Curated annotation (Swiss-Prot):
Residue numbers covered by motif HXTX 1: 34-37
Domain of life assignment: Bacteria
Active site location: H34 (proton donor), H115 (proton acceptor)
PANTHER family from the UniProt entry: PHOSPHOESTERASE SAOUHSC_00951-RELATED (PTHR40037:SF1), PHOSPHOESTERASE YJCG-RELATED (PTHR40037)
One matching Pfam family: 2_5_RNA_ligase2
One example GO MF annotation: hydrolase activity, acting on ester bonds
Keyword set, alphabetical order: Hydrolase
Motif (HXTX 2): 115-118
Similarity comment text for this entry: Belongs to the 2H phosphoesterase superfamily. YjcG family.
InterPro entries xrefs: 2H_phosphoesterase_YjcG-like (IPR050580), Cyclic_Pdiesterase (IPR009097), YjcG (IPR022932)
EC id: 3.1.-.-
Protein name: Putative phosphoesterase GWCH70_0799
């Protein structure tokens, strides 16, 4: 089965992101606005049990996660992805590192750029027009997130939560 690890921002940020995603993101119906912490990976039932145990340990040792969204940005020319930029911070960086070491070790395909995608798979002309307008807008959200999620992919391509991990020394619900 295919799994991934992400955190979901507040409803306020999700609503803001979705106001763009419904028009510009081909994955709009597959997953809510999120910040990917670990790209999709394959794991069998036994392996996922080990991973869940490790994720509980990581969560217990992770502080609440500050999120500061500051602007629209893009991965152009690598891809026509438009996103909300999340300012890197020590807690987020450390969490990302821990999710790519030990039994979770892998070769990450990309450098970690914390972001929330709002547009993808746009033709070049549409990308240029949309990004040209968005990058002029002021964006500012600040909050803390107290959980991250192990997700799994359903047959229709959508993602759903397998387990939620509370950070900051909070007890699991």
């Amino acid at each position: 089965m295919k799994y991934g690890i992400a955190l979901f921002p507040s409803k306020r940020i999700q609503d803001f992101a979705n106001s763009y995603r419904k028009r510009y993101d081909s994955h709009y119906a597959l997953i809510p606005p999120h910040l990917t912490l670990k790209e999709p990976f394959e794991a069998d039932d036994q392996k996922i049990k080990e991973i869940v145990k490790e994720l509980r340990k990581i969560a217990a040792e992770t502080d609440v996660i500050p999120l500061k969204v500051t602007k629209f940005s893009s991965f152009y020319p690598t891809s026509n992805v438009i996103y909300l930029k999340v300012e890197p911070n020590e807690t987020l960086e450390r969490l990302h590192e821990r999710l790519h070491s030990g039994i979770l070790a892998d070769k990450s395909e990309y450098v970690f750029v914390p972001h929330i995608t709002i547009g993808r798979d746009l033709p070049n002309a549409e990308y240029a027009d949309v990004y040209g307008q968005l990058r002029m807008q002021n964006v500012h959200f600040e909050e803390t997130v107290d959980r991250f999620h192990l997700l799994y992919q359903l047959e229709n391509g959508s993602w759903t939560v397998y387990e939620t991990f509370l950070v900051g020394g909070k007890e699991q619900e």
